[in-house]
Amino acid sequence: MMIKTGLMAAAFVLLAGCTAPSQNTATDICKADNQMQQTTLYFGLNRPAGAQITGNEWQQFVDQDVTPRFRDGLTVFDARGQWLGNNGQVAREPSKALMLSHGKDAQSETNIEALRGIYKSRFAQESVMRVDQPVCVQF
């Protein structure tokens, strides 16, 4: 019992000097004026009922809805979504990932949410996943 107590005390002493690594944010590590926000949106290409969203339909969405809101540019990736459904079956869906680098401002937020809403409505989608993170950008 005394050995066990001694070992625990030694472990506490050793661990007392340990600290969790600090989480550096983009503000901490970015050079002046190059901090931005990066938002990646994930768009499924399967309709709940009917044909898959075509390449032409996707490109029309990008050209007419995305680009006018993000004139400085964007990047599109082909992606494949996968998840385990409530029925225990693996579901897979071809997808598109849209990466936007933008300021952290109200207009960008409005534009991003508009894109999500337009896509869900136009293509009968349940959701458009959104992932945000601070980034350092240089051109």
Regions found by a protein language model. Give the residues of each.
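Bacterial signal peptide processing site
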Residues: 19-21
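Terminal, regulation- and interaction-focused segments at domain boundaries
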Residues: 36-55
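C-terminal motif of bacterial Sec signal peptides marking the signal peptidase cleavage site
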Residues: 14-17
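Mature extracytoplasmic domains of secretory-pathway proteins
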Residues: 57-95, 101-106
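Bacterial N-terminal signal peptides that target proteins for export
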Residues: 1-7
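A general secondary-structure signal for short beta-strands and their flanking turns/coil
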Residues: 34-38, 93-95
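Glycine-rich, aromatic-bearing surface loops/beta-hairpins
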Residues: 24-36
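Helix-rich interaction surfaces within compact, conserved domain-sized segments
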Residues: 90-139
